[in-house]
């Protein structure tokens, strides 16, 4: 079951964040040398904000292994962040970001669990009607996951990121949380 990280989890998240950026640099706009997600003080402040959350799955305990000490927390193996837009013009939207599952734990439902937890939080925010996210062209499994949760593609940003001279497109996706759009339509299929 996903947990919502608190300020005290900032060091654990920063460790996983560094692995994320090194494992899949094409999937994230940040790099280890300029990422605020590696700054513990920044993370502690962000995690204390009600309009910001990171959901995570912890490494399950191994059968037959002694339990961890009271102050020793398990490593994080999957995460998804969500933030409610603060601008009055975009207050009806939230954005999911930083979705990652450790390679050894992929394909086991951990990604789905943390993204679903983020969507559930967005549903609890009064006035939020849409959840947005982006997925790199190299992230086929992630795009399939998002589509299975109801996200639809609405645009493709050519050459959104560049790493070591290679450029990657990004697919922009949205999820309408409830009911039809204001014009009576319902985004139920990709527009690209």
Which residues are covered by each model-predicted region?
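Acetyl-CoA-dependent GNAT
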Residues: 7-104, 115-117, 121-125, 176-180, ...
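Short acidic/polar active-site loop segments enriched in Thr and Asp
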Residues: 128-129, 152
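Conserved beta-strand-loop-alpha-helix junction that forms the acyl-donor binding cleft
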Residues: 131-143, 160-164
């Amino acid at each position: 079951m996903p947990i919502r990280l608190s300020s005290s989890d900032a060091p654990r998240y920063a460790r996983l964040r560094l692995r994320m950026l090194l494992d899949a640099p094409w999937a994230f706009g940040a790099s280890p040398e300029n990422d605020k997600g590696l700054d513990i003080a920044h993370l502690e402040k962000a995690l204390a904000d009600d309009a910001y959350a990171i959901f995570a799955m912890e490494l399950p305990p191994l059968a037959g292994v002694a339990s961890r000490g009271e102050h020793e927390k398990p490593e994080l193996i999957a995460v998804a962040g969500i933030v409610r837009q603060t601008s009055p013009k975009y207050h009806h939207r939230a954005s999911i970001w930083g979705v990652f599952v450790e390679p050894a734990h992929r394909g086991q439902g951990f990604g789905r669990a943390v993204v679903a937890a983020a969507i559930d939080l967005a549903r609890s925010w009064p006035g939020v009607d849409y959840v947005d996210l982006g997925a790199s062209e190299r992230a086929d499994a992630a795009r399939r996951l998002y589509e299975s949760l109801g996200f639809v593609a609405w645009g493709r940003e050519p050459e959104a990121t560049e790493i070591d001279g290679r450029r990657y497109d990004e697919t922009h996706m949205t999820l309408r949380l409830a009911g039809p759009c204001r014009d009576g339509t319902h985004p139920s299929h990709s527009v690209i």
